[in-house]
Amino acid sequence: MQTSILIKSSCRPQFQRRFHHRMQKQIQNIISILSSASVINSYDENDIRHSKPLLVQMDCNYNGYVAGIPNSLVTLSVCSGLRGTMQLKNISYGIEPMEAVSGFIHKIYEEKYADTNILLEENDTYTWFNSEYQVRKSSEKTDFIKLFPRYIEMHIVVDKNLFKPANMICRKSVGKECDFTEYCNGDLPYCLPDTYVRDGEYCDSGGAFCFQGKCRTFDKQCDDLIGRGSRGAPVFCYDEINTRGDNFGNCGTAHCLFQHILCGKLVCTWEHRDLISRPNLSVIYAHVRDQTCVSTYLPRRTPPPVNSPISITSYYSAEDRDETFVQDGSMCGPDMYCFEMHCKHVRFLMNLKLCDASNHCDRHGVCNNFNHCHCEKGYNPPYCQPKQGAFGSIDDGHLVPPTERSYMEEGR
């Protein structure tokens, strides 16, 4: 991997003056912490970049102090002319070559800093412990390091970096029917956004809807809540329980109206003789038409909100729901789905003008959450045309044919 260093200057020459000062040569050589293969990128006043290998500049940077002046600091570079900074008690000077003039001629100017904390000050402990970078060698004296903190603004730029190969899985699907796997595309250092079947598409052989990447079946919700093969209850169980208007049967603040009874509390069947046992979970049992129907309740963990509406239950809004409620996206009738304890038409979830699987996907794919076709194996997106080895969508990162390696290169 090749690394380049971009050094940014935060100060500009303010004025020029002749300056002569006698300095004692108390210089320490800076030992580079970077690879000798690194590159120095600098920009001139016209924003033109100049690149030089770091190797030839590793032994031409020095720092020290001015003889006879306490608390002074000198940082010099002779890599390309004489450049550097001389910092005295309350003033700092810079030196650099005059590029427009031939010969060994330099200009010296007073430097102005926006952050006065960087200058030497009475409390040198502040500058040492509050600096973002602290570098020292074991051979250096601690007192000298604390007295002369050095500052540089540096950005590490990655010019060449090997990413994971294209078509490598970066996020596995969480369900077989409604969620899709995402792949590395070889050009980006991060995984693409999650892709899944568009909300309102059928799953579970037409018995449920996909919603937010999951197939929302009543059987799965009941098994997750109380386990042991519990299944979603028949409609007459929901009618019996969700019209009660208490903590075990409700659509929020009150009982459910008949058209919404499948969207309130989750009602399950229980075929075992022993009772349901789960910490903090209260359960009621109702025997309806030879079915044992159960509903559950979890005590509130937080007090009701201020100025909340009147409620004959312990729930005040859709945000109060927990796993004892029917999940949004559950089927509550033909082409109907639950949303916030109301039964609604599923057609409002889908924009068939943007994506209609029977027309846009050539009947070999399904619309995803970006309203693009996700194609079956052997069919190529975006319109699911036959192609060996192809599948997926333009959103999941899968490429055909795969590339073995991909680099991010400067100027690409």
Curated annotation (Swiss-Prot):
Domain (Disintegrin): residue spans on this chain = 111-199
Concerning InterPro entries, the annotation shows: ADAM_Cys-rich, Disintegrin_dom, Disintegrin_dom_sf, EGF-like_dom
**Do the record's keywords include rRNA processing?**
no
The tissues in which it is expressed are: Highly expressed in testis.
Q: Report the superkingdom from the record.
A: Eukaryota
Please verify whether the record's keywords include Nucleotidyltransferase.
no
Keyword vocabulary terms for this entry: EGF-like domain
- Pfam families of this UniProt entry? ADAM_CR (PF08516)
EGF-like domain residues are 351-385
Gene3D superfamilies in the cross-refs: Disintegrin domain
Subunit details = Interacts with TEX101.
Q: What does this protein do?
A: This is a non catalytic metalloprotease-like protein.
Q: What is this protein called?
A: Putative disintegrin and metalloproteinase domain-containing protein 5
- Lineage, opening ranks: Eukaryota, Metazoa, Chordata, Craniata, Vertebrata
Q: What would be the name of the gene that encodes this protein? A: ADAM5
